[in-house]
Amino acid sequence: MRTSKYLLSTLKETPNDAEVVSHQLMLRAGMIRRLASGLYTWLPTGLRVLRKVENIVRQEIDNAGAIETLMPVVQPFELWEETGRSEEMGPELLRFTDRHARPFVLSPTAEEVITSLVRNEVNSYKQLPLNLYQIQTKFRDERRPRFGVMRAREFCMMDAYSFDIDKEGLQKSYDAMHDAYCRAFDRMGLEYRPVLADSGAIGGSGSQEFHVLAESGEDLIAFSTESDYAANIEKAEALAPTTERAAPTQEMTTVDTPNAKTIAELVEQHGIAIEKTVKTLFVKASDEVDADIIALIIRGDHELNEVKAENLPHVLSPLEMADEAQLRDLIGAGAGSLGPVGLELPFIVDRSVAVMSDFSTGANIDGKHFFGVNWDRDVQLGQIEDLRSVVEGDLSPCGQGTLQLKRGIEVGHIFQLGTAYSEAMNCGVLDANGKNSILEMGCYGIGVSRVVASAIEQNNDEYGIVWPEALAPFTVAIVPMNMYKSDRVKEAAEKLYAELTAMGIDVLFDDRKERPGVMFKDIELIGIPHTVVIGDRSMDEGNFEYKNRRANSKEVIEIANIVEHIKAQLS
């Protein structure tokens, strides 16, 4: 590609509204342009990268035995009513009606559509296993789109759906897709981790996320120092302490704490260890509890894991905190002074709190706390659950090593849906005995456009993007110095361009009438892995200059050897 016939669209300055590095560099490198909130046009440079991600994903998913299809972005609302997700998805599911007042949605995912297709097209176990996928535009009406294409309303996604006659078949399909994901991300040159995850709104049982490791990641992942165990912070189990509860050494006393509204203030003002405090949080209860709200009790230095909490049968899902008015009406005190002693509402205790003794907690009276509280003496220990998020140094749930935490960007997710959708939509086939059997489903997604942004988050420097070679918009750049003043420079550049393109290499030939400094900055910004600089001075000595973007190195290469040198770099 010649830059004179190409839309380069690079920017010198970083736009003010770009918060993360990938958003900044995608704008500056001329990859995307904002159309509206969460909506982006992909310019030629960005589209080249997007297509490379798509092609790698397509090849590996094909190799896993999946078959490509293409489904509509517009879906009938009635399909979503069949599974009950029409309300579960909330306002992120964009609804509209056509001219005949028929309700539709813009697709954020396609479980309903694919299940409807399979129940009409597949009728025998002999047609299984079946795995269908598409690479298609999706739409999710995000409340707060941010970070460019990382959290956009419209995005490109690969979504696949497997159908099997039994759970054993589902496990095989799931494992095949897991391995295909690993091969795809390996080929892309990304540092990533597959981690155990919560199934969320998609539903089902087994679930793993694939995270690209990056400091800007919105998710925390926990992994063992001594094994392959890794889990999203939402899923990582906090084991019960190995120590037994110590015997009481203090009597329970009531202490005036008028200025201690938070755990931090209580610790600072009264000189107690934060590990000896508990905090009591109130959330809306589910129908399984004979109360409107329920208390969740965790250690003062721990954080409530909201996903773990809302997965409990006693807690309303999605999680909803009780408001101040409810607390005062039911308990007579406000947040900051609440605790389990004398509480006439149900409560659940975290594992770490269950082994505490001589601890401090709110007295359910404004401005007062109990010190020296002990279970089964001052308050009965009730239901115990894992309520907290893990912290660095916790024992790994696998029994090997301790947990470390890193930030990650979720780029893929695989689910064992089981019969959650197929049963709701009556998707079954005749088995070997001639009986109707509801199909076991798997669901698999890769955020193709998000992969592009996450690769940049992981691969950049002060000059711009440093693409993994498999994703770069161009593999080689040719920069002829003062080409329009030197016939031999132009001739050498044209010859090299023809040779490399004939070999199937993506080449950007910078034939602009620009200063060399401008050319070099653009090529570094775009992140082209290999650059060949052609100039009169080097040609006088029979050489070209070769630059490697990732190594940030320069070499002088004989003109006769330049093609072989580039081939060696690419092999």
UniProtKB/Swiss-Prot annotation:
Species of the source: Aliivibrio salmonicida (strain LFI1238)
Ranges in coiled-coil conformation: none
Subcellular locations according to the entry: Cytoplasm
Comment text on domains: Consists of three domains: the N-terminal catalytic domain, the editing domain and the C-terminal anticodon-binding domain.
Protein name (database record): Proline--tRNA ligase
Protein purpose: Catalyzes the attachment of proline to tRNA(Pro) in a two-step reaction: proline is first activated by ATP to form Pro-AMP and then transferred to the acceptor end of tRNA(Pro). As ProRS can inadvertently accommodate and process non-cognate amino acids such as alanine and cysteine, to avoid such errors it has two additional distinct editing activities against alanine. One activity is designated as 'pretransfer' editing and involves the tRNA(Pro)-independent hydrolysis of activated Ala-AMP.
Top-level taxon of origin: Bacteria
PANTHER family named in the record: MITOCHONDRIAL RIBOSOME PROTEIN L39/PROLYL-TRNA LIGASE FAMILY MEMBER, PROLINE--TRNA LIGASE
Family of the protein in this entry: Belongs to the class-II aminoacyl-tRNA synthetase family. ProS type 1 subfamily.
Catalytic reaction list: tRNA(Pro) + L-proline + ATP = L-prolyl-tRNA(Pro) + AMP + diphosphate
Gene (UniProt): proS
